[in-house]
Amino acid sequence: MRISLCQGLLTGAIILNLLILYYVSRAQQQMMEKRKELGRGTRRAALPASGLGGGLGVLVGAGGEPGVVGAEGHSRGPRVTVLLREFENFENYVGDVANSFLRQRPELPFLAVSDTSPYPPLVLPEGARLLVLSPSPDQPPQAHRPEFHVQTEFVLLVPDGVELEQPRAIERLIRELEGEGGGPVRLVAAPVLARSAVQCLHLRVNLREWTATYSPAASGSSGSVCTALQGDAVVLIRTEDLFNLSVPLGHPLFSSLFVQTALRGWKVKLLESPCFAANHRPLFSSAHNQWKADTRLKEATGKLMRSFGLKRLLMPDGKDQWYGCSKETPRCFGTVQDDTPDYLYLDRWTPPCCLRALRETTKYVINILETSGVRYWLEGGTLLGAVRHQDIIPWDYDVDLGIYLEDVPNCDHLKNLDSGSLVDANGYVWERAVEGDFYRVQYSEANHLHVDLWPFYPRNGVMTKDTWTEHKQDVEFPEHFLQPLVPMSFAGITAYSPNNQRAFLELKFGEGVIENPQYPNPAKKRLDRSKL
């Protein structure tokens, strides 16, 4: 078969194109491999820092070369960003701290972080940067997000006034953290000398009960391992771990940090050495500035705990700190619909401040009833809580007491309530409830947590009343349950109850009610008993 000239030219062109395509592909592959290799040595900042008078660009080390110092101080680039979060605008030493670290370790990125732009402005040395967290309408969302401004493997969280005297101290912290591998220790800390002694604490956070409990932790020979710190310390954490927290740089920093890490099961290891110096002691030059700082810290702690849904802190010294409702403020939840308060939908129980108010109101009301000669008994769900817990049911939102109707005239607080309400000398509000023929005692005019008093009278040996609610437990019952009334422990006091509590409760709620807890309206929200 003869090949024409045109066929020969076409075949040659095809072969030539295939050769060109082959060499172009090889060249592209080699170029990509070269770029990948170069990329291992240099990590570039994703975005410029906002409000800094210039971009972060590449985090430049000593001698103008990009890179981070490794565990031995001679790696290709800095592994640690020094971050200072806590300082006061009216008196601080952020510039001195930055100078201290950059003088010893000029290759390390130094980042000061503030909620708003400080006034007076910070005076920072070259190599230190300021990041303002509050967003500005003329900037992209990434501009105020710290995770876009930290490009190193670790973050070293330092307090104001600290000084780096030992350049190798940071490498010691890195080695300690890396030595923990993938275990529960995810943070390593070193003390700051000549400040308040740092203490290792155990922290247990119970979001369901709105509570955080701090307790002292024992020290070990190679350092203490715990879940929180109290006092001044320098803390090293992996950048990935820090920015996987819901609020990585909350204020106060340690309070925010350790609540979140404790919930994740992470631990912090507090070393005895190295130690960091404090070049300003005390941190504030006047008692007035110290008072201002303490006041701002208290306000910031309250704001933080409320944002985390923590209303009670049990401190290591046994004292309580409360961040919930009080006699002067409204209760923590609104009007209850379908017998299901809003907090149950959040998989939480009654806030501890609300339980405290209910206990105080119950104790107060029972004392007045007993003093006045009014026979009463723990009724309904309140009796159920007393039998199960010797306290209020953890998710209940009021207290119910039954009383003898014929005894109402004995009590000055009750007998004149047919019209209006009464605010007594201790701020409790006594009223005839608008929902029915019963009485209600509120914690205060502002806080409507309450005790309900249900008047019953005997008829043919049965305790009854004239109006009823739709609750299944609101039924008549034999008077023999009240003859006699028996004392029992309830909410820190001794109160009276029916004499056969199991039979009384099973008459009202059904068989097995004591052993099988359930929310008031399972059709709306059912209790997961496996989590009890």
Language-model features: locations:
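C-terminal catalytic/acceptor-binding lobe
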Residues: 12-19, 39-67, 220-225, 230-232, ...
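Active-site nucleotide-sugar/metal-binding loop of Leloir-type enzymes
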Residues: 141-155
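Conserved catalytic core of two-metal-ion nucleotidyltransferases
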Residues: 9, 16, 347-372, 416-508, ...
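Short beta-strand-to-loop acidic/aromatic patch adjacent to the donor-nucleotide binding site
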Residues: 151-165, 402
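Conserved catalytic core of nucleotide-sugar-dependent glycosyltransferases
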Residues: 165-246, 425-456, 463-471
